[in-house]
Design a protein with these regions (language model features):
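Bacterial N-terminal signal peptides
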Residues: 7-18
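Boundary at the C-terminal end of the N-terminal hydrophobic targeting segment
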Residues: 22-26
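N-terminal cap/lid segment of alpha/beta-hydrolase-fold proteins
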Residues: 35-75
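Alpha/beta-hydrolase fold nucleophile elbow
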Residues: 153-165
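Short glycine-enriched nucleophile-adjacent loop
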Residues: 167-178
Length: 282
């Protein structure tokens, strides 16, 4: 077996042990026991890792993506990277409950000698730009991997892991042949990756020519151009402070989708329920 294959298998085996539960959407309120466990995990992580939060990583068009980095304190050797890039909320501080969120994945990675890097997709939370599921995910993913490979603490080997939307962009970026893209674990990427006219598609929007209603409901909560944004000159320290005080997750009113999805034309469904204008307005 080739050395590169062995390295990839070892990377995948190690990353599989890191359950990326931090990026799942929140359920019920955490118990006191769970909050205590979160605090203990965060304290241990702080003792083992160099932590850089709200690093604004530049993309080729000048927009910057908000990124948190956790890497081993031992600087004697360069380390491989586990990379999670997501449209969902990974803020290190649970503003509602006044405690750290679950940082188990980050801690597990650092203990195994990996850096753990998580980035919000453009147009989400502290990242700049406007979210476009049909355009920027591929170029942003490739740019992020190249940026990480060039960091002085990196061994230029980046592996990705993630579920659903966080899985689908991996497949498209892998096809570009970035030499630093060493391994990938796309979990639950059932939506698929294809093309819609000139655009690469990050989701199976059409089946037999019919729009899939699942993605209309998903976009209702994910593609919101009307959101709070910080000035480009906001310091890293101020962004970190803001992330402890404000939860930028939108609180979308509930929708009876069994009725809403019967609206015609389909392109106006989100508008009809008071949602963001989204891609159908373009």
């Amino acid at each position: 077996m080739k050395t590169t294959q062995i390295v990839t298998i070892l990377f995948v085996a190690g990353a599989l042990a890191m359950v990326p539960g931090a990026h799942a959407q929140p359920g019920g309120a955490p118990t006191q026991q769970q909050l205590a466990a979160r605090n203990a995990t965060a304290k241990e992580l702080e003792s083992l890792a160099v932590i850089e939060r709200k690093v604004m990583v530049p993309m080729r068009d000048g927009k910057r993506m908000a990124t948190d980095i956790y890497r081993p304190r031992d600087a004697s050797k360069k380390v491989p990277i586990v990379f999670v890039r997501t449209p969902y909320n990974f803020n290190f501080w649970d503003v509602k409950n006044g405690a750290p969120r679950d940082l188990t994945s980050e801690l597990d990675a650092v203990k195994r000698g990996y850096a753990y890097v998580e980035m919000n997709e453009r147009g989400h939370f502290f990242s700049e730009g406007e979210y476009d599921i049909l355009g920027s995910p591929l170029t942003d993913g490739a740019d992020a991997i190249s940026w990480m490979a060039a960091q002085p603490w990196s061994n230029s080997k980046v592996g990705t892991i993630g579920c659903s939307s966080t899985a689908e962009w991996q497949l498209g970026v892998a096809a570009q042949g970035n030499p630093a893209f060493a391994a990938m674990i796309p979990q639950g990427f059932g939506a698929g990756v294809g093309r819609v006219k000139p655009y690469y598609e990050q989701g199976n929007w059409y089946r037999g020519g019919a729009v899939q209603m699942l993605f209309i409901a998903w976009l209702y909560g994910e593609q919101n151009q009307v959101r709070p944004m910080f000035p480009p000159n906001t310091s890293q320290a101020d962004l970190i402070q803001a992330s402890r005080l404000f939860d930028l997750a939108p609180q979308m009113p509930p929708v009876d989708w069994s009725k809403a999805l019967q609206h015609l034309p389909e392109m106006d469904i989100i508008k009809a329920v008071g949602g963001p204008r989204g891609i159908f307005a373009d």
